[in-house]
Design a protein with these regions (language model features):
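Iron-associated oxidoreductase/ferritin-like identity signal
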Residues: 1-174
């Protein structure tokens, strides 16, 4: 279907949304990378949580894409960065914290710019996304702090113990 080309008063919002889309796609891929490495190491809870967050980031990508299309923009599905090959859990959490901080800052800026452009829906979308990213940030901070408090061996052993206990009780699920 051919789109009618007109001057789009929402071009600023479309650009912000596409920038966010690239970040969400890249972040989803990064967290999926972490998920498979935690799973391979036998850390079921960490793996499942990372998978859930990766899927949440992909849902964000879909929401952003839907908004771009509604505004009659063109969706750019290119990830904004290449997946980093990180295998150390502390470094995984540190990088995730860095990603979430950066994303929250950019979403707060985008919300402000969208409001200035009189695009209240995109403004609210960025505010809502920032809230979800703050939840991810809180999780990553807590896990990193636990890892630092307990030390690598104890923290990861607790992850394995929790998995074994849950499996024995039939509580491990998606």
């Amino acid at each position: 279907m051919e789109k009618i080309k007109v001057a789009n008063k929402y071009q600023k919002s479309i650009d912000l949304l596409n920038d966010a889309l690239g970040k969400e796609i890249a972040t989803s891929l990064q967290y999926m990378y972490f998920h498979v490495h935690f799973e391979d190491a036998g850390y079921e809870y960490l793996s499942k949580k990372m998978r859930m967050i990766s899927i949440a980031e992909m849902r964000h990508s879909e929401e952003l894409s839907d908004r771009i299309l509604f505004l009659q923009g063109d969706v750019n599905m290119n990830p904004s960065f290449t997946t980093r090959q990180i295998s150390d859990p502390k470094e995984m959490f540190r990088f995730a914290i860095q990603l979430e901080h950066s994303t929250i800052d950019s979403y707060n800026d985008a919300a402000r710019i969208a409001a200035e452009a009189d695009d209240s829906v995109t403004h609210k979308m960025f505010q809502d996304l920032a809230v979800e990213e703050e939840e991810h940030l809180d999780y990553f901070r807590n896990e990193l702090q636990n890892l630092l408090d307990y030390g690598d061996k104890e923290y990861l052993a607790l992850q394995s113990f929790a998995r074994s206990k849950a499996e024995a009780e039939g509580k491990v699920s998606e």
